[in-house]
């Protein structure tokens, strides 16, 4: 819906009531929101929440199970941290309770892009950082509105 609103309008801000970020992979969500921000030329507002329905949580991300509220809050905080890193840093890494980026010991194998010490260990070709594409239009990120925390 946001992409449709971006295509049909030129001035209104485009926001979501809340993205339940605990249900999503933070890298995919960061890229999706950044793409919408690019398409709208910086008109995106991001609402984030941790979810309230156990039936959704357990089926979309078992780590978000609301039976353990403390764990759900930690997942929310870590997911938001990854989103902000993905948007604000050219290359980033993250080693948390729920997410580790880049995947440990992943060897760079991409003939179409040159290797760089910005994101890899040049001695053994393992990835040390990753990047999301595109970055948001708004720098460093679209405004974030938290429903919780």
Task: Specify the residue positions occupied by each region the protein language model found.
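The substrate-binding groove and active-site-proximal loops of carbohydrate-active enzymes
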Residues: 15-24, 67
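Core alpha/beta catalytic barrel or barrel-like domain that forms the active/cofactor pocket
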Residues: 12, 17, 47-51
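Internal, glycine-rich beta/alpha segment that forms the wall or movable "lid"
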Residues: 25-149
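N-terminal beta1-alpha1-beta2 module of alpha/beta enzyme domains
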Residues: 1-14, 139-142
């Amino acid at each position: 819906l946001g992409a449709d609103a971006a295509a049909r309008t030129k001035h209104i801000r485009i926001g979501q009531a809340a993205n339940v970020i605990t249900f999503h992979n933070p890298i995919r969500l960061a890229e999706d929101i950044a793409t919408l921000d690019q398409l709208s030329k910086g008109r995106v507002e991001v609402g984030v929440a941790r979810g309230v329905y156990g039936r959704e949580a357990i089926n979309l991300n078992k780590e978000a199970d609301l039976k353990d509220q403390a764990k759900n809050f930690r997942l929310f905080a870590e997911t938001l941290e990854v989103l902000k890193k993905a948007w604000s840093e050219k290359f980033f890494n993250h080693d948390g309770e729920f997410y580790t980026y880049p995947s440990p010991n992943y060897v760079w194998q991409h003939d179409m892009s040159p290797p760089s010490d910005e994101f890899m260990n040049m001695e053994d070709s393992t990835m040390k950082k990753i990047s999301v594409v595109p970055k948001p239009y708004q720098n460093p990120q679209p405004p974030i509105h938290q429903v919780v925390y």
